[in-house]
């Protein structure tokens, strides 16, 4: 049963699904769609042509779908789409998009922690975690299963590849290749996100191929393009390696991050249970 508190403001025209809860003093504007089992907590504000997927919770004082912070915006009809079973925590802001018909999108099962900011024309994949105060500028693309630590700033038009992990307080100015881990301002790649991939049950053989790919691309004397070609020849049967190469070859407004933390070790066991080491 849907439960809307008497002090909540739900404008005529808003589409409210089954078993939705809207707590005291929340505001839901007329073009909003709340799917089944959504919870909107006290003082949350949802505006614009916003759709929030089933089972998602919007926590107190979060703001979704409000006017983008972009001087190019001239009142066009734009959209926000949030997937299922997400947690949009306190004071997070997800603005609407800029340019007619465009969308800010967030996938399923995402955790957006307090004070995070997702700007106009951003795209965020599934199973993503943004820690407190993560700040995305406009047009940023974030792949699936990405974790970004607290107080990270991401420059507009940057792409962050799937399964990567960005350390806290980093400054991201260039595209982050998938499956990598890094930190810093300026940012430095530390290697492959071994622990994250293991937790996602990526196989030992795949992790090994990715570590060798990283070493070839970022720690060899080959040119960048030549190293991408050679890893395809040697490890092209591994889908994750092909994805890594395709990401690095795609058109980019910012370029691929190639700064590497040379002190980061690639000799650690990538699976304690299997006990395997990768030689440097």
UniProtKB/Swiss-Prot annotation:
Listed name of the protein: Acyl-[acyl-carrier-protein]--UDP-N-acetylglucosamine O-acyltransferase
InterPro entries, sorted: Acetyltransf_C, Acetyltransf_C_sf, Hexapep, Hexapep_transf_CS, Lipid_A_LpxA, Trimer_LpxA-like_sf
A Gene Ontology biological process term: lipid A biosynthetic process
Species whose genome carries this gene: Chlamydia trachomatis serovar D (strain ATCC VR-885 / DSM 19411 / UW-3/Cx)
Subunit structure, as described in the record: Homotrimer.
Main location: cytoplasm
Protein family per UniProt: Belongs to the transferase hexapeptide repeat family. LpxA subfamily.
Function per UniProt: Involved in the biosynthesis of lipid A, a phosphorylated glycolipid that anchors the lipopolysaccharide to the outer membrane of the cell.
This protein's UniProt keywords: Acyltransferase, Cytoplasm, Lipid A biosynthesis, Lipid biosynthesis, Lipid metabolism, Repeat, Transferase
UniProt keyword Lipid biosynthesis, yes or no: yes
Cellular component terms per the entry's GO annotation: cytoplasm; membrane
Reactions catalysed: a (3R)-hydroxyacyl-[ACP] + UDP-N-acetyl-alpha-D-glucosamine = a UDP-3-O-[(3R)-3-hydroxyacyl]-N-acetyl-alpha-D-glucosamine + holo-[ACP]
Gene3D superfamilies in alphabetical order: Hexapeptide repeat proteins, Udp N-acetylglucosamine O-acyltransferase, C-terminal domain
A GO MF label: acyl-[acyl-carrier-protein]-UDP-N-acetylglucosamine O-acyltransferase activity
Lineage of the species this protein comes from: Bacteria, Pseudomonadati, Chlamydiota, Chlamydiia, Chlamydiales
Record-listed E.C. numbers: 2.3.1.129
